[in-house]
Amino acid sequence: MDSKSWLRCINGCGVEYSVYDVKYYCEKCGGLLEVAHDLDQLRKHNGLEWRKLFESRSIPGETFHQSGVWNYKEWVLPDLDNHCLTTLGEGRTPLVQSVKLGEEMGVPDLWIKMSGTSHTGSFKDLGMTVLVSA
């Protein structure tokens, strides 16, 4: 595929679809589909370069950069034109330290994403901004 992102079957049968096709299952084997990205394209930038880019977008400016999803557009749906983005700023929910759960799990510094403080109280806001924009 020429796209930087596509859908592919998780069963490994080799079938791929455009991310813009409304498909939920592989037409060849019935397997679920996952979003795949051109990792070679993403590796053209090192971690520090990605961090600088994402942190630079934290400064008030274009609305979609204020989204906790679209701030990372290159990792979500890089081929989507910016004018197609639809956002209410979802994804900017806090991380909360969970000491007791961390102790039970053997993770001394466990942090949990509090998606319940989002617009609808649901983690589904994160996926819906991508669905509506595409």
Residue map of PLM features:
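PLP-dependent amino-acid enzyme catalytic core
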Residues: 1-134
